[in-house]
Amino acid sequence: DMYDEILKQGSKIVDGLSSYRQPVFVHIPPAGELRGGSWVVLDSQINARGMIEMTADAHSARGGVLEAAGLVEIKFRADRQRATMLRLDPTYAQLARDASEASGPAQAEARRRLEEREKHMAPFFHAMAVEYADAHDRAGRMLATGALRHAMPWAETRRYFYWRGRRRMMEVRYLHACLAA
């Protein structure tokens, strides 16, 4: 990336879009993802005039800085996973109580059973965490946070952009005419 000057070109795009005076439409198509630096470059909040509008497919588009699995690796480490297991898994909670109350060889056996249960349940809790994180990357959540203007099925996109483009161009034309007067 450094050799190809990707970051330098991305910053030029951000500079250009932040001062752009015409409407820009960004659409995430079905099964499309907008991640990482691309998300930052095309974020609708970088233009103070509100000229950038982001839309997405309502069913399968994803967007965000990190992928769900990467977010889980950062935010849901082993200690938090154990705390969640303790809160949600009654068997794990009982084994943890047994391990803390026991002493000597009984404590070693109780800890072994606790670790065994943790290893058994860890994949399930990891999968739930990834699904939860992925739910925050879907169109519904992006709409709720204001990152998207509209989420629509793929069949409606052509009609939507035709009419939205016409309206935005007229709005901009009238705005420039009023400012020039």
What are these regions (language model features)?
Residues 1-181:
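Ligand-binding clefts of soluble mixed alpha/beta catalytic domains
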